């Protein structure tokens, strides 16, 4: 068996299948495009579904690939086993209605055993097969495999409900008796016993039958076009061919582990408990590739998966003694390992590192905030004499602070407290139940009732007209089809229409319907797509309408043009975002209204004022450049070759519309647009905000609204100039700055006066010194305006040797503020305040020399002061 690097294994795989007439399908992005059924690309075949379902006919029915994939259904096992991973590479070869069983098995055996290729020893290979699949058994025998190396397994049959199905045959490598301490042998395979001796390296699925749940498998009908779908994990092949005990000791992971050794000062031992090393190495690979492919950490979906992976890796870093941000430092190593086939990680490493480091820093703050709350909870348990942290409190730490449950468990148990696991599960279930109950179904247009679903009449939208004559095909009133209607509201379908149905972020047209006399018989207030795709006009009926009659349909042209200004400007904005803040800023949603446009995009931080200025300037430059706007109908692949930027998550057919604005912007879009960018007139950003982790929103206006926005700003500036008595508008900023400086000086003077007053009052407070357990302390209630004054008292106290400990309490409004300061090592201010604060229904914490807390029960202030002697 050849000892090859992972890069050599990958390349040899692709070269072999190319020699058998296969074309190489490039590895796709981990984030699926136009496939809402998948969170991630999770296998080699996932990107080829379009070929297997017949929606796209491949130029070559023989395909091979090396596909990066992510699976997250078993995250907790990563690091515990030798072969679990979140991100992995699946090597595959596929036949779409071309070769079948004989070639798949023969060529597979050749690749594995030929001295020209992998050169596996034949006696180390074992194959499982479906018992009724005698053809596969016989084919393996024909290849020279000993019958004793063929194991029938009842589960070797692939099917998911009705549809394509078939037997599969798996190939295993025998690592020998050293990995079978109980000498169980082939029973490990036959009885599917978890083991480290027989390593599955390849699975060949023979898509042969059309599964029918109503009949036994023996009666399944054969498919007219049979397919081959195979998958071999690169990580497992590398482990076998490099003689590694686990996948983690291969060249895919060890360079990362070596870097973790340097960062932690700990040593990885292949025979020891190395879970934390493995978790970190695995998770940073997944994070690097996923972020490089456009996914960002967040609170839901893919973002939540990434956040969970990062936080799990950080916690394992802490177990290794790494308490500072460190994961981001591993990104270049991941890029170097994978550079030969996936150069994008190194190319984007600066961006990936920035995202990872930012998320690490956010999590560090989360840990700090959660730790303070947990400390308060544990202090309260101690004060109440309890020994168990309640599930509802664990859940609050998890839900409100984002504090990992496992960290809560670890810290609480280290402090000697038990954990209410069942209570936590109950609180979690209650939240899930509330979330499900809060789901509200959409309105009538969201429900495909039988009446709407029964509309089969054809209807065509005409892009390039504002008015046309068309025959009325369908009338629906009171949820029933009718031949005529004379009042109320109705839904109408015409043979053709100039009215755009709401789609792709563009709002629907409005307008009117006229009869042959020119009288308006209906007002169109909305247009949506019917279940079968026809534009469905919602109208207020003003006069009689009847099926089969021709009417003139007129849209509100002024409104359409205003919407088109915003839609075309949205395309310019998308391109400008790419140019100014980076190509990772991809569309996450949009709305093009008459009055404004709204654009949501992926980005990891607020867009700075300077960046917004550049974006706004660049969009206006393209408007003033008077770029010609063209639309082309073509297929998706040609659109990509034209440089189309995004698919917007829409489901497109074989023909798509490409909207091109000069040489500046190219996008797939089914909406309506202007003819020239100059028709937009003017573009103005009015707001930029965050709408969730990793997602930002820009709201902008165009044309008349943009002019109004600028004029409103000018009016506001004039008002400010008049208020500060600036002689000209350009002098207003300097006048405001001068007033601000003056105010700051007055505030400083006021603060100094307050300090002097506090110092005078402190003389009386500091006279009352008590002693307990050999510690001198002052405990007093003071009358102050804010918590800052308490700190001023403490600062004055520190200047002289009044006492060892200072405890001050103040009732400020409805709240109680408590301060503890300590000069002696015998009293920890942070710990002391945790014992005192609960007396006034408060919580708090701090450092050994200074701590503060807030409470709500002012009636217990005297009790708190009396308790000081017991707590010093």
From Swiss-Prot:
GO cellular component term, pick one: cytosol
Annotated Pfam families: DHHA1, tRNA-synt_2c, tRNA_SAD
Residues given in the record as Zn(2+) binding sites: 567, 571, 669, 673
SUPFAM superfamilies per the UniProt record, alphabetical: Class II aaRS and biotin synthetases, Putative anticodon-binding domain of alanyl-tRNA synthetase (AlaRS), ThrRS/AlaRS common domain, Translation proteins
Chief subcellular location: cytoplasm
Entry keyword Transferase: no
Cofactors demanded by this protein: Zn(2+)
Enzyme class name: ligase
Cofactor binding annotation: Binds 1 zinc ion per subunit.
Protein localization: Cytoplasm
Catalytic activity entry: tRNA(Ala) + L-alanine + ATP = L-alanyl-tRNA(Ala) + AMP + diphosphate
InterPro entries xref list: aa-tRNA-synth_II/BPL/LPL, Ala-tRNA-lgiase_IIc, Ala-tRNA-ligase_IIc_anticod-bd, Ala-tRNA-synth_IIc_core, Ala-tRNA-synth_IIc_N, Ala-tRNA_ligase, Ala_tRNA_ligase_euk/bac, DHHA1_dom
Record keywords: Aminoacyl-tRNA synthetase, ATP-binding, Cytoplasm, Ligase, Metal-binding, Nucleotide-binding, Protein biosynthesis, RNA-binding, tRNA-binding, Zinc
Family: Belongs to the class-II aminoacyl-tRNA synthetase family.
NCBIfam families: alaS
Function: Catalyzes the attachment of alanine to tRNA(Ala) in a two-step reaction: alanine is first activated by ATP to form Ala-AMP and then transferred to the acceptor end of tRNA(Ala). Also edits incorrectly charged Ser-tRNA(Ala) and Gly-tRNA(Ala) via its editing domain.
Protein name per UniProt: Alanine--tRNA ligase
Organism per entry: Streptococcus pyogenes serotype M12 (strain MGAS2096)
């Amino acid at each position: 068996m050849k000892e090859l690097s992972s890069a050599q294994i990958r390349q040899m795989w692709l070269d072999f299948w190319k020699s058998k007439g296969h074309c190489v399908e490039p590895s796709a992005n981990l984030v699926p495009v136009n496939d809402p059924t998948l969170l991630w690309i999770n296998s080699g075949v996932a990107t080829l579904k379009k070929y297997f379902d017949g929606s796209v006919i491949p130029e070559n029915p023989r395909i091979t690939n090396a596909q990066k994939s992510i699976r997250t259904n078993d995250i907790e096992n990563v690091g515990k086993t030798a072969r679990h991973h979140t991100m992995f590479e699946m090597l595959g070869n596929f036949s779409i209605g071309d070769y079948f069983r004989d070639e798949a098995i023969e060529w597979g055996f050749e690749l594995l055993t030929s001295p020209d290729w992998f050169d596996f020893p034949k006696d180390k290979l074992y194959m499982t097969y479906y018992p009724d699949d005698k053809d596969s058994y016989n084919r393996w025998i024909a290849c020279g495999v000993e019958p004793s190396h063929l194991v029938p397994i009842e589960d070797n049959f692939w099917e998911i409900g009705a549809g394509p199905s078939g037997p599969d045959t798996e190939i295993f490598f025998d690592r020998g008796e050293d990995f079978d301490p109980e000498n169980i042998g082939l029973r490990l395979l036959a009885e599917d016993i978890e083991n480290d001796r027989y390593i599955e390296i390849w699975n060949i699925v023979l898509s042969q039958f059309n599964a029918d749940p109503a009949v036994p498998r023996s009666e399944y009908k054969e498919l007219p076009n049979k397919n081959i779908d195979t998958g071999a994990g690169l990580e497992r092949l590398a482990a076998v061919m490099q003689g590694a005990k686990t996948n983690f000791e291969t060249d895919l992971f060890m360079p990362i582990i070596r870097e973790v050794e340097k960062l932690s000062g700990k040593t990885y031992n292949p025979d020891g408990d190395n879970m934390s090393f493995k978790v970190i190495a695995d998770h940073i690979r997944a994070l690097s590739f996923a972020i490089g492919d456009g996914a960002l950490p967040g609170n839901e979906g893919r973002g939540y998966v990434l956040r969970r992976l990062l936080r799990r890796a950080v916690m394992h870093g802490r177990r290794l003694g790494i308490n500072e941000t460190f994961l981001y430092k591993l990104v270049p190593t991941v890029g170097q390992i994978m550079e030969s086939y996936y150069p994008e990680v190194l190319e984007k490493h600066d961006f990936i590192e920035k995202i990872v480091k930012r998320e690490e820093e956010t999590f560090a703050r989360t840990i700090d905030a959660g730790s303070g709350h947990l400390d308060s909870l544990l202090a309260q348990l101690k004060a109440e004499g309890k020994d168990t942290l309640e599930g509802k409190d664990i859940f609050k730490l998890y839900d409100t602070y984002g504090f990992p449950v496992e960290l809560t468990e670890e810290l609480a148990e280290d402090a000697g407290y038990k954990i209410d696991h069942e209570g936590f599960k109950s609180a979690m279930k209650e939240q899930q139940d509330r979330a499900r109950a809060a789901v509200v179904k959409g309105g009538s247009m969201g429900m495909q009732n039988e009446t709407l679903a029964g509309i089969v009449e054809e209807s065509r939208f005409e892009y390039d007209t504002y008015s046309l004559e068309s025959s009325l095909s369908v009338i629906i009133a009171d949820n029933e089809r009718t031949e005529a209607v004379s009042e109320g509201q109705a839904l109408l379908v015409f043979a053709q229409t100039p009215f755009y149905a709401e789609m792709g972020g563009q709002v629907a047209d409005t307008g009117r319907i006229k009869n042959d006399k020119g009288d308006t018989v209906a007002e169109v207030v909305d247009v949506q797509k019917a279940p079968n795709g026809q534009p469905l006009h919602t109208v207020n009926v003003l006069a009689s309408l009847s099926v089969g009659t021709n009417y003139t349909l007129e849209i509100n042209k002024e409104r359409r043009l205003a919407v088109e200004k915003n839609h075309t400007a949205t395309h310019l904005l998308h391109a400008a975002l790419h140019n100014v803040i980076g190509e990772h800023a991809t569309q996450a949603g949009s709305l093009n209204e008459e009055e404004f446009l709204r654009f949501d995009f992926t980005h990891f931080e607020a867009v700075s004022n300077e960046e917004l200025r550049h974006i706004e300037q660049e969009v206006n430059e393209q408007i003033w450049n008077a770029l010609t706007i063209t639309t082309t109908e073509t297929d998706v692949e040609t659109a990509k070759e034209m440089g189309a930027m995004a698919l917007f998550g829409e489901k497109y057919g074989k023909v798509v519309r490409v909207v091109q604005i000069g040489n500046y912007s190219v996008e797939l879009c089914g909406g309506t647009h202007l003819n020239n960018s100059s028709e937009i007139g003017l573009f103005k950003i009015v707001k930029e905000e965050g709408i969730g982790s990793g997602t930002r929103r820009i709201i902008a206006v165009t044309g008349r609204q943009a002019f109004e926005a600028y004029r409103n700003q000018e009016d506001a500036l004039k008002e400010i100039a008049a208020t500060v008595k600036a002689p000209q508008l350009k002098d207003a900023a300097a006048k405001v700055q001068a007033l601000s400086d003056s105010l700051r000086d007055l505030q400083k003077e006021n603060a100094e006066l307050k300090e002097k007053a506090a110092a005078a009052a402190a003389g009386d407070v500091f006279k009352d010194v008590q002693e307990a357990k050999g510690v001198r302390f002052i405990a007093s209630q003071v009358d102050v305006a804010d918590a800052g004054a308490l700190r001023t008292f403490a600062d004055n106290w520190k200047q002289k040797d009044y006492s060892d400990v200072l405890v001050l309490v103040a009732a400020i409004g409805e709240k109680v503020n408590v301060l503890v300061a300590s000069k002696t090592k015998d009293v920890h201010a942070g710990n002391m305040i945790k014992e005192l604060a609960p007396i006034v229904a408060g919580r708090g914490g701090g450092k050994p020399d200074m701590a503060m807390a807030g409470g709500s029960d002012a009636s217990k202030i005297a009790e708190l002061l009396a308790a000081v002697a017991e707590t010093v």
